[in-house]
Amino acid sequence: MDTSYPREDPRAPSSRKADAAAHTALSMGTPGPTPRDHMLWSVFSTMYLNLCCLGFLALVHSVKARDQKMAGNLEAARQYGSKAKCYNILAAMWTLVPPLLLLGLVVTGALHLSKLAKDSAAFFSTKFDEEDYN
């Protein structure tokens, strides 16, 4: 048996393969900010601003956004988070704007009635003479 030439271990990788594998770079893109799920805002909307179940819809989309974020699907999480934000804004507007408009109408109506009452009191306190009827 001739053992004069060096033998290579068949299980050991060659130096060329090791160098190529050691310097391989993968470009994954720049990681952006994690998408927001607006969970706390959705819970608040569900508890206090749940007109037409918009707060509940916001909560459902917030849970879906959190699930997608945990699963690693950031684009779907961003979409669900955006929908949750829109439903939270709608729930807040539909719950807070009508009472504020009603309050504004009551205040302006009260001011108008007080002016009208003052003018009518001045009208009825006027004393007419006999000459005014002739």
Swiss-Prot record:
Cell compartment(s), UniProt = Cell membrane
Q: What happens when the gene is disrupted?
A: Embryonic lethality, leading to the birth of only 7% homozygous mutant pups, instead of the expected 25%. Only two out of eight pups were female. Crossing homozygous mice gave rise to about one sixth of the normal litter size, and many newborns died within 48 hours after birth. Homozygous newborns display no striking phenotype other than smaller bones and especially shorter long bones, and this phenotype persists into adulthood. The radius, ulna and tibia are frequently bent in newborns, but this is no longer the case in young adults.
Which residues are on the Extracellular side of the membrane? Answer: 1-39, 110-134
Query: What does the UniProt induction comment state?
Result: By interferons.
Q: Where is the lipid attached (S-palmitoyl cysteine)?
A: 52-53, 86
Main localization is membrane
Extent of Basic and acidic residues compositional bias: 1-20
- Residue intervals annotated with topology Cytoplasmic: 61-88
Matching InterPro entries, A to Z?
CD225/Dispanin_fam (IPR007593), IFITM_antiviral_protein (IPR051517)
Q: Which UniProt keywords apply?
A: Cell membrane, Developmental protein, Lipoprotein, Membrane, Mineral balance, Palmitate, Transmembrane, Transmembrane helix
Task: Name the organs or tissues of expression.
Answer: Detected in embryonic bone (at protein level). Highly expressed in osteoblasts of adults and embryos. Expressed in primitive hemopoietic cells.
Instruction: Output the PTM entry.
Output: Palmitoylated.
Mode of membrane association: Multi-pass membrane protein
Family matches, as Pfam families: CD225
On subunit structure and binding partners, the annotation says: Interacts with FKBP11.
Give the similarity note: Belongs to the CD225/Dispanin family.
Anything further noted?
Membrane topology is controversial. The N-terminus is cytoplasmic and the C-terminus extracellular according to PubMed:24715519, while both the N-terminus and the C-terminus are extracellular according to PubMed:18442316.
The name this protein carries in UniProt is Interferon-induced transmembrane protein 5
Q: Which organism is it from?
A: Mus musculus
